């Protein structure tokens, strides 16, 4: 059940709904009286006075422009997940993202802009990580090694592809090491 569903059910029952920091548990489980989103767990009523300043800061944060709204999904087994909705939409493909940073990075795919340039060969990249990975082509650095056959790779994806195909590698290495 999602937070909005629980909040509307609580409003029907006359409970305190819409509070940014408090959610009453509606499950049939033996829950503590209050559910505190700020600490991602339950707290006792006796803790109210101790956490009053925390509640005030949460109320202030809920009015801030930078506040990220969170959705709490409560499972039937009592576990819960805090999910951040994808509110940033790409105007080119309508892809959804959790932050403006991820949206801006994604839009570079559509615009063709590649702000990161290799100083050796002038290749350009959308992400800094891709440039750093590319630089290993020039340096010859191969930091990723197969533990079965000890072959080295410059990229993790190449090592993972090798590992999928290297099942016979272990038996070859073992036979070679132990054969007389």
Swiss-Prot record:
Cleavable signal peptide: none
Zinc-finger ranges (C2H2-type): 88-110, 116-138, 144-166
Subcellular location: Nucleus
Disordered: region residues: 1-62
Cytoplasm among keywords: no
Modified residues (Phosphoserine): 19
Cellular component, GO, one term: nucleus
Protein name, as recorded: Zinc finger protein 740
Species the sequence originates in: Mus musculus (Mouse)
